[in-house]
């Protein structure tokens, strides 16, 4: 695995493209690029702009991004904004001709996607072929609505087929079943999306909307967090998780080195960030490696609501903690030793599941704090979220509630829904089994 290749991003649906706005705003700031794709600073030798950007013939930088939606509002808004109107390659944008969206219906999004999939895949493959060495694809979407879940599911199938050896990492926004949502059929959309998330990506970063709102409300001191608040948190997760590749880390120079899924298909990743700061307020805390590490490892810090319900058998399967800022190497080693005893791993697993490392900061952006961190955590503690959503699905399905919304879609069969439910249940069984001593020998 020598050398470092490039990454491209695919953003699908309203939520996926709203995340694109926040993520790419962070990327241009962190790489010293203005809204016209021009550099604003002298290049730093550790700044690998070409990981996520390419240079056009006039040398301005262009995001290696593909934007997809079945209705035009969000993408049109981006392209009319001063931050993005001259940044993206308009040939990499797909919007449906009819512009009617998918009506928050997975079946509609999936079946409409079948009609336009070749056009979208032509864009993605062309962009990939313009890259000398593609390492992976970052994919943003929601699993609750119609386009992000349905069209997103279809594109994940096609991406895996087209790029069998590339890393596919999704940032998937979930609507927690314990909270209200304006999408009454979201448990159906979720279970159908989950099958494709189980079968296709290498990693799925689970972003629970309820947990994101709770964190934003507490840290930004508002009862009604905005999309900007929520999306800034997700952009921070995406930014920090890619920082080692973007700024020349020797410890983790490529997404191909990220070993987060030793037991596939258990590749669903929780995340936590610290500190969370309102950019409009003065930051008065003193940060340290020990303080940030302690916060990141608290179950209540995870971006998954049910993570606060600690279960005695839950195990960490694999995790990475990226620490940024003014840090001496020995403090990371000390912190790693101090937390190792508190981490529960599967009884058959001898390796340390947590790897802690220093991740470089952008040379062009000065943070408000001296030390910050991100935890990417593959733990069995994510299973209660899936159990909760599957229970909600079972209740709706047993009553055939809102099933007519799916039955009226051409080329959709309810067998697809039932098959997906069984695949999700198999995943939950796997989470229960992996904490047992005989996990590796069962069935032999």
Swiss-Prot record:
One GO-annotated biological process of the protein: regulation of mitotic cell cycle, embryonic
Residues that bind GTP: 144-150
Name of the protein described by the UniProt record: Tubulin gamma chain
Family: Belongs to the tubulin family.
Origin superkingdom: Eukaryota
A Gene Ontology molecular function term of the record: microtubule nucleator activity
Main subcellular localisation: cytoplasm
InterPro entries, per the entry: Gamma_tubulin (IPR002454), Tub_FtsZ_C (IPR008280), Tubulin (IPR000217), Tubulin/FtsZ-like_C (IPR037103), Tubulin/FtsZ_2-layer-sand-dom (IPR018316), Tubulin/FtsZ_GTPase_sf (IPR036525), Tubulin_C (IPR023123), Tubulin_CS (IPR017975)
Function of the molecule: Tubulin is the major constituent of microtubules. The gamma chain is found at microtubule organizing centers (MTOC) such as the spindle poles or the centrosome, suggesting that it is involved in the minus-end nucleation of microtubule assembly.
Record key words, sorted: Cell junction, Cytoplasm, Cytoskeleton, GTP-binding, Microtubule, Nucleotide-binding
PROSITE patterns per UniProt: TUBULIN
Pfam families: Tubulin, Tubulin_C
One GO CC term on file: hemidesmosome
Subcellular location: Cytoplasm, Cytoskeleton, Microtubule organizing center, Centrosome; Cell junction, Hemidesmosome; Cell junction, Adherens junction
């Amino acid at each position: 695995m020598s050398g470092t290749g490039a990454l491209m991003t695919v953003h699908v649906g309203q939520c996926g493209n709203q995340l694109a706005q926040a993520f790419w705003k962070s990327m241009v700031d962190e790489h010293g690029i203005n809204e016209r794709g021009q550099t604003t600073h002298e290049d730093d030798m550790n700044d690998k702009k070409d990981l996520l950007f390419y240079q056009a013939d006039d040398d301005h930088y262009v995001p290696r991004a593909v934007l997809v939606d079945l209705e035009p509002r969000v993408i049109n808004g981006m392209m009319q904004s001063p931050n993005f109107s001259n940044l993206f390659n308009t040939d990499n944008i797909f919007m449906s001709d009819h512009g009617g969206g998918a009506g928050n219906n997975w079946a509609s999004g999936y079946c409409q996607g079948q009609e336009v999939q070749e056009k979208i895949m032509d864009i993605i493959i062309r962009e990939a072929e313009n890259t000398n060495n593609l390492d992976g694809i970052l994919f943003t979407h929601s699993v609750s609505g119609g386009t992000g879940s349905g069209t997103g599911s279809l594109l994940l199938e096609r991406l895996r087929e087209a790029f069998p050896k590339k890393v596919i990492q999704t940032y998937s926004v979930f609507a927690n079943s314990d909270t209200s949502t304006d999408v009454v059929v979201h448990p159906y959309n979720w279970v159908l999306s989950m099958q494709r998330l189980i079968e296709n990506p290498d990693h799925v970063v689970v972003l629970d909307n309820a947990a994101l709102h709770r964190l934003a409300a507490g840290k930004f001191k508002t009862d009604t967090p905005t999309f900007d608040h929520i999306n800034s948190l997700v952009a921070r997760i995406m930014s920090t998780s890619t920082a080692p590749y973007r700024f020349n880390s020797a410890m983790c120079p490529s997404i191909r080195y990220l070993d987060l899924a030793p037991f596939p298909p258990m590749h669903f990743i929780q995340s936590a960030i610290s500190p969370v700061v309102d950019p409009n307020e003065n930051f008065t805390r003193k940060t340290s490696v020990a303080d940030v590490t302690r916060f990141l490892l608290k179950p209540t810090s995870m971006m998954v609501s049910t993570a606060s319900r600690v279960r005695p058998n839950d195990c960490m399967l694999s995790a990475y903690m990226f620490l940024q800022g003014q840090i001496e190497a020995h403090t990371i080693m000390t912190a790693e030793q101090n937390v190792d005893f508190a981490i529960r791993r599967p009884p058959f697993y001898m390796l340390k599941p947590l790897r802690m490392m220093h991740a470089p900061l952008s040379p062009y952006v000065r943070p408000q704090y001296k030390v910050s961190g991100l935890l990417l955590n593959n733990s069995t503690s994510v299973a209660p979220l899936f159990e909760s959503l599957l229970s909600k699905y079972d209740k709706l399905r047993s009553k055939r509630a809102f099933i007519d919304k799916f039955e009226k879609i051409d080329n959709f069969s309810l067998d697809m829904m039932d098959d997906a439910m069984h695949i999700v249940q198999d995943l939950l069984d796997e989470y229960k089994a992996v904490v047992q001593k005989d996990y590796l020998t069962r069935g032999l």
